[in-house]
Amino acid sequence: IILPRFLDGLAKVPPRKRIRIRREAAALLKGEMRDGAVDLALDYFALQEPGYHSECVMTETLLSLSRRDHPTVAERLSLETFLSLRHVVLAPRTSTMPMIDLALSKRGLQRHISVTVPHFLSMPMMVQTSDMICTLPRRMAHLYADHFHLKSHTVPLRIPRFPVYVIWH
C-alpha cells in the first residue's frame, strides 16, 4: 500500500540504490539501522529509543475477506459465522498476539486457524479457492478483494484503529 508511492519518490534517487524488503519487526533491525545497512522500517509499533525516529504515516482497521460464492458467509459477517470458519493467517513476526486474537481472547473466544502463511499475498489466493477467510489491513483487503474477486466484510469485533509507523535512525 505504501510501497508504490514510496517507489515513485525513489525515481529521483541515484540508480545504484537498491530496495530490499524484509519482514522483520523494526525492533529486530535496530542494529542494522544504526549501522546504516537498513535505512527505513515500517511497523505497527513505534521504536521509542534514543537515536531512532518513528512517524505515524497512516492508521488502519481490519477487514475480512471471503470468496464471493462462499456457502456460509452472508453480506454481513456475524461473530458466530466468523468463529465457525477456518482462517488463513499471516505468520507472526514477533511473539505478540495479533490484535484480532487478543480481542477474541478477552471474550473467552478463539478462531479456528487452519493455515499460516509467510506473506500477505498468499492469504487471498487461498481464500479464493477455499471456504477459508482471512483478515487483513483495510487498504490491502480492498486491493486484494478487487484483484482476486473476493468479498470484504467488517470484522464482527471491536478492534481499535492501529497506526503504521515509518522508523529510521
PLM regions and their residue ranges:
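Alpha-to-beta junction loops
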Residues: 33-42, 62, 109, 127-134, ...
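Short hydrophobic/charged patches on amphipathic alpha-helices used for structural packing
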Residues: 30, 34, 54, 79, ...
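Flexible hinge/capping segments at coil-to-helix
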Residues: 49-87
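Central regulatory/effector-binding core of bacterial HTH transcription factors
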Residues: 1-49, 117
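Short loop/turn segments at beta->alpha junctions
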Residues: 25, 78, 118-119, 137
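A late-sequence structural motif
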Residues: 1-2, 6, 68-74, 79, ...
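Secondary-structure junction motif
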Residues: 2, 44, 72-79, 85-107, ...
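Beta-alpha-beta core module
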Residues: 49-60, 121-169
